[in-house]
């Protein structure tokens, strides 16, 4: 999923919220910053080589932020 922000500070604050959720779940997304104000989040369980329930749960938490 892609997110756009007005400032880098807003992006960083949102990324910190995602990191906090990810740490609580011990399940971490791939995050890429594009053009300083765009954040791309990818959820995939690499050791299972598929999208799992944990990915869906983390996606729900991210969507609720």
Region roles according to the model:
Residues 1-65:
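Charge-rich alpha-helical segments
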């Amino acid at each position: 999923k892609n997110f756009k922000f007005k400032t880098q500070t807003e992006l960083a604050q949102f990324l910190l919220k995602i990191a906090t959720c990810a740490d609580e779940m011990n399940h971490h997304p791939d995050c890429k910053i594009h053009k300083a104000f765009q954040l791309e989040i990818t959820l995939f369980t690499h050791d299972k080589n598929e999208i799992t329930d944990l990915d869906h749960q983390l996606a729900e938490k991210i969507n609720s932020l």
